[in-house]
Amino acid sequence: MQGFVDVHSHVVPSGDDGAATVDEGVELCRIAFEAGTRILFATPHAHADWDHFPRTAGRRDLYERAFPLVRDAVAAWGLDLRRGWEVYPSLVADGEDPRGYVLEGTRAVLVEFPGWWLDVDGAVGLVADAARNVERAGLVPILAHPERCPPVAADPASVRRLAEAGWPLCLNGPSLTGDHGETAERTAWRLLEDGVVSIVASDAHGFARPPRIDVAFAAVSAKIGRAAALPLFDGGAVPWAA
């Protein structure tokens, strides 16, 4: 195995709830590297204007200044740190150009599931609208942490149509190991057993939520076998750029 590919982390300062300093970002990357990750995407939140972390000019500037500092520091170890964003679905559902949010070196945009304030039809419908607009731009939506969306947790079968549309569902590794609570853990395993999951990522936010997908890899391997688990972690399901 060449190493893990982690498409979802908040390890570069951007003014969101992830790494606060370049030094913290470097140390988080060290944790990822020592745990076996070789390609790591730094994906700060890009929320709607009314939400916690809108992608303001100030936040973009902070991220663009911090990113090369972290990237260059970790490159010497052999860790490939890449740019990206975690996009709130209403941004691209409402027509914003998704090409500004692409995961570097891929044809993918990471779109997050919304929170508790929508019912299941509203949540899945909003994500589907965003995914269709990403697809119209010639890109592939990767749909982040459906298991942490309460309406989906109440009705896990609701996301099958998203997976059947060819849109990769991406679980948080910590959900599989119980670190996001019993409901997220139960839902994550249900989705995995239903065969609708394509990718597992860390969604790391700091030292309390580190970028270690090796722990989830061990748990999934114990459940379904290493050969079946590996494609969820090695980047095989990521739509890489030609």
Language model segments and positions:
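An N-terminally biased module of ancient metal coordination in phosphate/nucleic-acid-related enzymes
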Residues: 1-76
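Hydrophobic faces of well-ordered beta-strands that scaffold small-molecule active sites
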Residues: 5-9, 40-42, 81-85, 109-111, ...
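Active-site mouth loops of central-metabolism enzymes
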Residues: 11-22, 112-121, 176
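Charged helix-capping and loop-helix junction motifs
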Residues: 21-24, 124-129, 154-161, 182-190, ...
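Short acidic/histidine-rich active-site segments
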Residues: 45, 196-212
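Extended substrate/RNA-proximal surfaces in nucleic-acid metabolism proteins
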Residues: 51-168
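His/Asp/Glu-enriched short active-site or ligand-binding loop at hydrolase and phosphoryl-transfer sites
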Residues: 166-178
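Mid-to-C-terminal alpha-helical segments outside catalytic/metal-binding sites
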Residues: 214-242
